[in-house]
Regions:
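Terminal low-complexity/charged segments
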Residues: 1-152
Length: 152
C-alpha cells in the first residue's frame, strides 16, 4: 500500500496517518473502524489481520487492529470511552476478528456489537463476578476480585 493510498483512505474516513519505519498507524473515529479495517484488508498486500489488542489509556480504551505485510505492519487504531465501551464488530467482514474481539470484551469490557460471542465468556471463568470490573482495566484490584470469587 502506498502512502498516497493510505492518506486517501484516512481522508475519506476522517482519520490521520502516522508513519514509522516499520509500523504505520491509521487512527479513525470509532464509527469508522469497520470501514477502515475492510479498506485496509482489501488493498493489495494488506490481507492479513494478525491480532486485535486493547489498552486502558485513562478515560478511554484504545483498540488496535494489527495488519501485516511482509516486514511492515499497519495498525488501525480507535478509542472508545470507558463510560460507554461499545464498538461495531468487524466479524461481518473479517471473521478472523471474532475471537480477538471476544477476548477484549472479557478482559477490558468493550462490547463489540455484532460479534457472536457478545455477552459470553471466552477467557474468564464462569465464576468471575458479573459486577466485578474487567480485570485488565487500570485500578482493578485483583485481591478484591479474589474475595468476590471466594478464592481468598
Amino acid at each position: 500500500m502506498s502512502s498516497e493510498e493510505l492518506s486517501l483512505l484516512a481522508s475519506r474516513l476522517g482519520g490521520t496517518v502516522t508513519a514509522g519505519p516499520k509500523t504505520t498507524v491509521l487512527s479513525v473515529p470509532p464509527d469508522r473502524v469497520v470501514e477502515a479495517c475492510v479498506g485496509v484488508s482489501s488493498l493489495p498486500g494488506w490481507y492479513h489481520l494478525t491480532t486485535i489488542t486493547g489498552m486502558d489509556i485513562g478515560q478511554d480504551i484504545a483498540i488496535l487492529y494489527h495488519f501485516w505485510q511482509g516486514k511492515r505492519f499497519l495498525q488501525v487504531r480507535t478509542q472508545v470511552p470507558k463510560s460507554a465501551p461499545r464498538l461495531a464488530s468487524i466479524t461481518g467482514s473479517l471473521a478472523a476478528g471474532t475471537i480477538y474481539e471476544a477476548e477484549i470484551q472479557d478482559v477490558l469490557g468493550v462490547a463489540f456489537e455484532g460479534n457472536p460471542f457478545l455477552g459470553k465468556r471466552v477467557i474468564l471463568p464462569d465464576a468471575y463476578p458479573p459486577d466485578a470490573p474487567p480485570p485488565l482495566r487500570k485500578g482493578t484490584d485483583p485481591h478484591k476480585i479474589k474475595k468476590m470469587m471466594e478464592l481468598e
